[in-house]
């Protein structure tokens, strides 16, 4: 049960992170929509009549339409974003999600018997009935009349597309269908899954939609003030676990409804606010966004000042730099994790107080009828765009006095609790955690090492503020080192680690992935010549490293391999063997790095760092593993002469193009490779010598 909960939490983390990709598009869309609308605002035109010029107004219309089209197609963006996030960013998953979403929508429309006349008749009626119009069950999605599944439909098909990708991206098909093998198969299977999903949702979704509508009406209609308070508390409480993205998504994108001037239904607090901003009508939305501004712009920066003031005198300079950076980040952008995690683990009582104050902030903003939109977070940038530019309708100016009051509350409450309870906030620790001074280029290498190196990483990801890593053995993770490297906090849930590095988290993740893929070399492993050329560091010790023959047969030069990929040394230098037996043994002491799914090739790494590929036969990939038996697993340690693979040589001779087996050093770089043996060779005889 415990392991099941850990896996469930890990999946929730991945889904939460995946939702950030489409959400990250919204600030750009919001800026286009806001500025485009402002450029033909009557009040602004009164002060700047020159903006009434035809071309300026045309530009404003283009900007407004460009922003609006993003909000109109959020379900599609969520489908593609969810698929990309859960499939490791591979574009094929995004294409599969797009295809799947269109097919699912078309299937639901046909099964439910929805026509385009149903859509237009509702739109015409909505113009007459206004906001009293009944919630429609139908929608027009890219010209397809279908059920109104909103962003939930996008998330569902996006997750299914990602599952199809992860399951089938390396599938092998018979030779006559070879063109459709691998990643090309993913959109095809997703199409079939989408048809089934569309059929199921045709019957399941209507009662689910009724339930969501009833829940929305209950939360927003019965006691909205209490709902905003509870929303604020839960949203902040989920921040440490990285699950807040999942929680607020229904409130922002589904709950509530508004019929715009065109007669189209708009769902979700954030989307409704944008539609009302565009229509120029009084705001009724913003209840689930406005509450962030007082504590993000004023409260938390004041808390940072309190932490700085209570630090030991000899530590204030260091703490002051950290707190100033975190406070400015919170004030300007609304990214609060670097500051929140600085006291979350060392003084949880402060975070409890912060959570309660966040809930009251949402409540007070609602009671004062302050309604400000948001696309990114509640910082000063969003405050200008979605508050001050519409101050006459949003009551945005009230944020300033309320924010000042919250700044005073945060400062004095944090000061009191820190002193009264002797909390070990930054700068007050009994044992000082020394920061490790590393360069930007060295940081991802250091973080990777602190996570237990690449063999310990099962899944690597990141969102706006945190590095999310699923490890195989969390006992290998050096939490203290991560903090020394700049993580303001490290959260552990099962084997899921979250290191809070702030806005640079995604770049660290990108660089770590590049390192793990062998695309980035450590600065410590490179030297620069006087001519400015970069040389790879030595991969073997002085005296060279010997590679022994893994197969008995005839050793020949690579130029004799009837495949240009190998004969032209596109994959690296080495040698080839025409096998006489079907046994393959380890050519050195080291580790198994990779086993191809079709079992025809195996990648090894020696203790000296030599990476070797043994590719048995040519065009053996099409055999789909038939005739091959692998005797080891990935990440197994191996010793010289250990059996790695058994091959049915007669079967390979009959069904493959050739049995000749290239043995390639894939990371030789500028190293010198000397052939020690050609002609007849026995397993275990010296075959190659690698020298720097």
Curated annotation (Swiss-Prot):
A single GO molecular function term of this UniProt record: D-glucose transmembrane transporter activity
Residue ranges annotated for the PTS EIIA type-1 domain, each copy included: 563-667
Record text on activity regulation: Inhibited by methyl alpha-D-glucoside, methyl beta-D-glucoside, p-nitrophenyl alpha-D-glucoside, o-nitrophenyl beta-D-glucoside and salicin, but not by 2-deoxyglucose.
Primary enzyme class: transferase
NCBIfam families tied to this protein: EIIB_glc, PTBA, PTS-II-BC-glcB
Membrane topology term: Multi-pass membrane protein
Gene Ontology cellular component list: plasma membrane
Chain ranges of the PTS EIIB type-1 domain: 441-522
Record-annotated membrane-spanning stretches: 15-35, 84-104, 140-160, 185-205, 215-235, 287-307, 318-338, 344-364, 370-390, 398-418
Signal peptide residue numbers: none
Induction pattern: Up-regulated by the antiterminator protein GlcT.
EC number: 2.7.1.-
Active site, UniProt feature: 463 (phosphocysteine intermediate), 615 (tele-phosphohistidine intermediate)
Domain remarks in the Swiss-Prot or TrEMBL record: The EIIC domain forms the PTS system translocation channel and contains the specific substrate-binding site.
Keyword Transferase included in the entry's annotation: yes
CDD domains: PTS_IIB_glc (cd00212)
Location(s) in or outside the cell: Cell membrane
Full protein name: PTS system glucoside-specific EIICBA component
Taxonomic superkingdom: Bacteria
Keywords: Cell membrane, Kinase, Membrane, Phosphotransferase system, Sugar transport, Transferase, Transmembrane, Transmembrane helix, Transport
Task performed by this protein: The phosphoenolpyruvate-dependent sugar phosphotransferase system (sugar PTS), a major carbohydrate active -transport system, catalyzes the phosphorylation of incoming sugar substrates concomitantly with their translocation across the cell membrane. This system is involved in alpha- and beta-glucoside transport. Can also transport glucose, but not galactose, fructose, mannose, cellobiose, sucrose, maltose, lactose, melibiose and trehalose, as well as N-acetylglucosamine.
Domain PTS EIIC type-1 span(s) in chain numbering: 6-430
Provenance organism: Staphylococcus carnosus (strain TM300)
